[in-house]
Regions:
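Active-site catalytic motif of lipid deacylating hydrolases and related acyltransferases
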Residues: 27-48, 53, 91-179, 327-368
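Loop/turn elements at helix/coil->beta-strand transitions in domains of secreted/extracellular proteins
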Residues: 84-86, 129-133, 177-180, 206-210
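Surface cap/lid and interfacial helix-loop subdomains adjacent to catalytic sites
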Residues: 2-9, 37, 165-177, 198-336, ...
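Gly/Ala-rich beta-loop-alpha elbow adjacent to hydrolase catalytic centers
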Residues: 183-193
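Structural recognition of the beta-strand scaffold that forms the well-ordered cores
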Residues: 87-90, 134-137, 182, 210-213, ...
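Extracytoplasmic/periplasmic/luminal assembly and interaction segments
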Residues: 60-98
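Hydrophobic membrane-insertion alpha-helices, especially the h-region
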Residues: 7-24
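Short extracytoplasmic
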Residues: 42-71
Length: 368
């Protein structure tokens, strides 16, 4: 990786950590807003500019794509491809930082495209032992769209979601009848996934192994009822939702809480402080506690971030007040943990091996 990309990636991850999720609204008048908010008003794209998800070029990962980033595994991990795989639909987080538009191009290329592949490689790969992985390109809302509660920002997020929904419909249409479905997303991707669970509730009935809605807060009583799905309370439960947000001690999630508590779900229900969903990915239980020896592998990136090794049995975690608090011997993951000890960027990497085992276990239970 060239030095320019490396430095730009640090800048990107730093912004995501400081301003990710609901926390970014706290910086409305700050330098961050001036630096990142898209210039001008939102302008709807031409109807003909939308993606065609019948084309392989509209996907970052799907069966048959050469140099598929979702097929990656860290050194020392052996993957046995399932003879009758499930299908995973994965939605990547924000990777577009420029201010020239409210939504990225379908294939933004350059650093934004590189970062999207990096997230598919490090996150979606956790599901590749049991499933084909489909990861769409989509006209993601630019990072700055999260900095404002404005009509323009809402329109940008809605456009991104419409692409995701269209991609999901194409994904589902391509699956043989009865194929088990796994859903996963992170940050902006998790936000879109939370909407998809509502809009495609009927299509998912009887087919969903689990939904991994990671790095975006969910209320059990305000958000989940509209999906018709329960939280995953046990490691072999299926047709349920997992969600977590990772912090280390001393944790200070006030930036997330200040904007989330009291906000309302799509159905108008107020979100309450004591109702945030936390699943422990180490044991698959809601509000669970797990010691470091139960962690089947943390991804530790190499110097240029192009690959990673697995560190087993080093990081434990417990759910506390709706957040996942990590402990143990956290390996050096990079300089991206910022104020509040928020490990947002590492929500998947910290537990990669255990997420891999979790989905294998739930799929086995689904097929039993």
């Amino acid at each position: 990786m060239c030095a320019r990309r490396f430095l730009f990636l640090i800048f990107f991850l730093t912004l995501i950590m400081v301003a990710g999720a609901f926390a970014v609204y706290q910086f409305g008048a700050s330098t961050l807003t001036r630096m990142a908010t898209p210039q001008g008003r939102y302008e709807p794209p031409s109807p003909r500019s939308g993606p065609d998800y019948k084309l392989a070029s509209s996907w970052l990962a799907r069966p048959g794509i050469a140099d598929n980033p979702a097929a990656w595994v860290p050194d020392g991990v052996v993957t046995t491809i399932a003879t009758s795989p499930a299908a995973t639909f994965y939605i990547h987080p924000t990777t577009y930082l420029d201010r020239d538009r409210w939504n990225a191009a379908l294939d933004p290329g350059g650093d934004a495209g590189f970062r999207a592949r990096l997230f598919v490689q490090s996150q979606a790969s956790a599901f590749n032992a049991v499933s084909d992985i489909w990861a769409p390109r989509y006209r993601q809302a630019a990072f700055g769209a999260f900095l404002l509660k404005s009509e323009d920002a809402t329109k940008a997020l809605d456009l991104a979601y419409r692409d995701v929904r269209a991609a999901f419909d194409a994904f589902l249409a391509a699956q043989p009848a009865g194929t088990p479905v796994i859903l996963a997303g992170h940050s902006q991707g998790a936000l879109h996934l939370s909407r998809l669970l509502i809009d495609r509730r009927a299509a998912l009935k009887g087919r969903l192994v689990a939904a991994y809605v990671v790095g975006w807060p969910l209320s059990v009583s305000a958000d989940l009822p509209a999906t018709g799905l329960p939280p995953c309370n046990a490691p072999d439960q299926t047709g349920c939702v997992l969600s977590w947000q990772s912090f280390a001690e001393p944790a200070n999630p006030s930036l997330v809480l200040d904007s989330w508590v009291g906000s309302r779900s799509a159905s108008g229900v107020e979100r309450k402080r004591d109702d945030m969903l936390c699943t422990n990915p180490l044991n698959g239980a809601r509000d669970g506690d797990a010691t470091p020896d139960t962690n089947l592998g943390t991804l530790v990136p190499n110097g240029d971030l192009a690959s990673a090794t697995i560190a087993v049995g080093q990081v434990g975690a417990r759910c506390e007040d709706g957040f996942l608090i990590v402990n143990g011997r956290i390996p050096p993951l990079g300089p991206y943990v910022l104020p509040g000890n928020n490990y947002h960027v590492y929500d998947y990497a910290l537990f990669w091996g255990s997420i891999r085992a979790d989905v294998e276990r739930r799929l086995a239970a689904f097929r039993a």
